[in-house]
Amino acid sequence: MAHAIDPKRAALLPLDLQQDNIAGTPGIAEKKILANIARLLEAGRGKRMPIIHITASVRADYLDMPRSNELWRALRASKKLILGTPGAEIHPLVAPRSDELVINKTCVDPFLSTNLGQALINFDVNTLIVCGLWTNY
């Protein structure tokens, strides 16, 4: 059974589309991942849906990241996704526009360390369309 999405009550959440993540993920170009997400963003913009870009980046001293998570421990060792560095920037092909929110998370779940929940309430959203490189976490 197909479910209709009401664009007035839906938001698009592109996750973790930062330069360091893209450089570390094989097959991006071959699978046309960024091109497909860019098309999805344009469709959402055409429907005037809220678009909330979620990034994952931390301080250079890593004091704001969880130490108990294996994924984040690996990040610390890699010296990547540091706030203010080119690697933490969203790729230009899927970059936010000035009227779109960018919310940075410092843990795997964007609801735990951000104001994402409040933003969705503010937009009166009841449906999320999630896309990105690592959406299985």
Residue ranges and their predicted role:
Residues 1-97, 101:
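Active-site acidic carboxylates
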Residues 84-133:
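Internal catalytic-core helix/loop-beta-alpha segment
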